[in-house]
Amino acid sequence: MAHNIYENVVLSNKVNEILETKVNLNSYMTIDTTLSANAGNKIKVNTYSTTSGVEALSMGEGNTKDIEVNFTSKEYEVKTYQGRFAFYDEQEQADPMVVDTGLDGAAKDMINQFNALAIAEMDKATLTHEATAWGFDVVADAIAKMDIENEAGLFLLVSPADQAAIRKALKDNLSYSEGFVRTGYIGNVCGVPVTTSKAVPSGKAYLGTKEAVTVFIKKDTETEYDRDADTRANKYFVRKVGVVALTNAYKVVKITIGA
């Protein structure tokens, strides 16, 4: 049996197809590719917030305070996220699905890595909401804390461990939209799609829009193949180079249940 070797461009397309099928990162994070045009391995990210300053005034009165713009600046280091899949010719000869299965696993690991990074950034949210148990009011109150007029684009990420409790608590308030198909999707509440992610710890949830977290891509999905002809050992490398950062602290609410 001749050995089946993928060209790198074919391999890259296969991995990208898997990534797009498993999860659409654009739904939960903003993708920024400006790093690819700039030299250097560090990026300074400013996270902005504003103070309230609108007041009810009587005739002749003026404002007693200003609306202020504040920001915190943090330097991030660009990192390489890489997965390696290895197998021997004999393994593929015994089971032709070895390569496709390995690529699927590498893509899932990449997804899990970026999801975990995004959740870690969301956990830095300045807007928080605490509740003793799940309920319709938990989501409604969290939305109110965002103080936004247009709720389109909101999502709620929860832990799979809390899925049963959420279903029981929300009951008829949890509706299903056939137009919203995502891995882990369990329904809508207050018009917001609820999706599970293994990166979310039990007892926590994150309500937000994709403007909260930005993925700064230095290099998009890159693949590389290496083979030792003597031992018939094959290695496929899948990598992305970039930074995941919280860029708008007012576009995400950290919900803590059981507080």
Regions from the PLM with identified roles:
Residues 39, 137-140, 144-229, 240:
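Extended oligomerization regions of viral-like shell subunits
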